[in-house]
Amino acid sequence: MTASFSDVRALVSESFPESLEQLKNLVRIPSVSWSSFDPENVAQSAEAIADIVRETGVFDKVQILRSLKSDSSEFGQPAVVARRNPAPGKPTILLYAHHDVQPPGDLAVWESDPFEPVEKNGRLYGRGAADDKAGILAHVSALKLLSHVVENIDLGVVVFIEGEEEFGSPSFDNFLQDHHDLLAADVIVVADSGNWNTETPALTTTLRGNATFKLTVNTLDHALHSGMFGGAVPDAFMAFAGLVSTFYSESGSVQIEGLQKSSIQTPEYSDEQMREESGILDSVSLIGDGHVLERLWSQPSITVTGLDIPDVAHASNTLLPSVSARISVRVAPGQSSEDAFKAVQAHIAKHIPYGAEVVFDDVNLGEAFSTDTTGWAAQAVTSALGQAWGTEVVDMGVGGSIPFISSFVSAFPEAQVLVTGVEDPDSRAHSPNESLHIASFEQAIVAELLFLAECNSREL
């Protein structure tokens, strides 16, 4: 690197207002990728991102590409891809983020328009501000400045900005297959996670896997009068509620035979911090056993995330013949999601009350992830994060899942996969009033520029 650290920080600081303005422009595009929303917004977002990638001057060609969804004749949402090949002996770095966002949800809960960015108390509020449009701008802003801190750009660079991550990446596997050579890299940087807090950067080293499915419980062939038959005939919700109670121990830990735990090192973190960050009510206790971070990072969890039953306003005095639920299982690193799902299936078959009929549908599996932090790229990104923030970096687990990472690992088994991001505990990704800590965003650009400069000097 020909520039000093102070030069790097000054360059980023000088250009940061433009980066922030570009981020605001992206947030204004309601690029929700769910099938019930207007796909033209996602297409508009892809065009806007292609334009800012072109402005870096790093690439000769920037493309907007689509692939067919798995098991479908329908194309997925548009992705933005650009590639610059490396000089001989130099590594290629793939920079991933996604430009689609979650639906805004209940607008009445938002304190401002979700698609009109608002700065307040050092944060930028808006849907996608943190997840994941700031990740896009961290990549682009660092690339735009790279030529100012190295003599020649010798490393290879791939920019891959997906357009359907929030909808489960239905065309992702086909996309990797269709464009394998275009995307091939030695290092893959996934900017879709977060930091320990606004003062402490983190490298995400583990992610739980997931197994989600629809479960239907049937006890009757039609609804029955609750006075005429209640007390003698079980309804479907009664059976379902009894089943759910068997998922947990008295402490709230998952007690499903065959679901595994793993061992992980955890940084210092208290139950009080968890209470404060989660917003749990004062009267409510935390659940589970072991260190609170082990419960999130290295133990399984199971949650009913949706339920199809009559709403209170329209409920009649009947026994329900059928109940359907969406169930989410988080899988500890080290266990395959398929094995975890089979364990849950076996538990349900064994413990469903009253001999009720159960049907499984819409099963989606995503693998857990763990990375080797001894690789040269992991060491380089840790060093860059530490320099940018001026403090030690936390190796952090995340209780959530990023299922497409396992697709990256399968498609490019020799690549080092690094998971970074700009979120923090107050970002509220996927929730109303999502926000980005603006100073952390600037630090992320500094860190990425330092990392790319180090990669540029690396010989394979």
PLM feature spans:
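Acidic, glycine-rich active-site loops and adjacent beta-strand->loop/helix elements
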Residues: H99-V101, F160-G168, A191-W196, T219-D221, ...
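Acidic-enriched catalytic cores of C-N bond-cleaving enzymes acting on peptides and small amides
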Residues: S226-L307, Q335-E357
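A short beta-alpha structural unit
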Residues: V329-A332, V358-T374, V398
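Short pre-catalytic strand/loop immediately N-terminal to key active-site residues, enriched for Gly-Thr
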Residues: K120-D131, T391-D395
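Acidic/histidine-rich catalytic neighborhood of metal-dependent amide-processing enzymes
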Residues: L124, A130-T206, L460
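Acidic/His- and Gly-rich active-site-bordering loop/insert found
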Residues: T2-R127, L146-L155, I327
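Zn-dependent metallopeptidase/amidohydrolase metal-coordination segment
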Residues: T216-N218, F240, L307, L319-V323, ...
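Short, solvent-exposed beta-strand/turn "edge" segments of beta-rich domains on protein surfaces
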Residues: A232-V233, H314-P321
